[in-house]
C-alpha cells in the first residue's frame, strides 16, 4: 500500500463512521483488532467487542455525532489523523447523565 491509498482509506473510514452504522466498521477494522482506548476503556480486544462496548453506547449517547478530520498524514505503513468529534449529549454515557449540551472533543488517532 502507498501513502495516498492509506490516507484515503482512513478518510473513507471516517465518512462511514458518520453514518452511525455499526456494520460500516467491518469494512475498515480487522475482526481481531485491539483498540487502545483512554482511561475508562483500556484495551478492547476484537471488532465485535469494540462495536458493542465503545461505538454502540457512543452513538446512542450522541445521536448527532459527527467526526471531521483536520489533518491526515500517511506513509506506506502508518496513518495518523487529528480532528474533532461533535455531538449532543442525549443519553447516559459512562455513567454520566445526559446534559442536552453540545460537545466538541479533539482526537488524534494512529494506525499501523
Show which residues each predicted segment covers.
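Short, structured motif recognition centered on aromatic/hydrophobic residues
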Residues: 10-11, 35, 58, 79, ...
Amino acid at each position: 500500500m502507498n501513502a495516498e491509498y492509506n490516507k484515503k482509506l482512513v478518510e473513507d473510514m471516517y465518512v462511514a463512521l458518520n453514518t452511525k452504522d455499526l456494520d460500516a466498521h467491518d469494512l475498515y477494522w480487522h475482526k481481531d483488532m485491539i483498540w487502545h482506548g483512554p482511561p475508562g476503556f483500556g484495551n478492547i480486544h476484537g471488532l465485535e467487542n469494540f462495536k458493542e462496548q465503545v461505538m454502540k453506547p457512543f452513538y446512542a449517547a450522541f445521536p448527532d455525532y459527527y467526526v471531521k478530520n483536520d489533518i491526515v498524514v500517511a506513509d506506506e505503513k502508518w496513518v495518523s489523523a487529528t480532528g474533532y468529534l461533535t455531538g449532543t449529549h442525549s443519553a447516559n454515557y459512562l455513567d454520566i447523565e445526559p446534559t442536552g449540551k453540545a460537545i466538541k472533543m479533539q482526537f488524534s488517532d494512529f494506525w499501523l
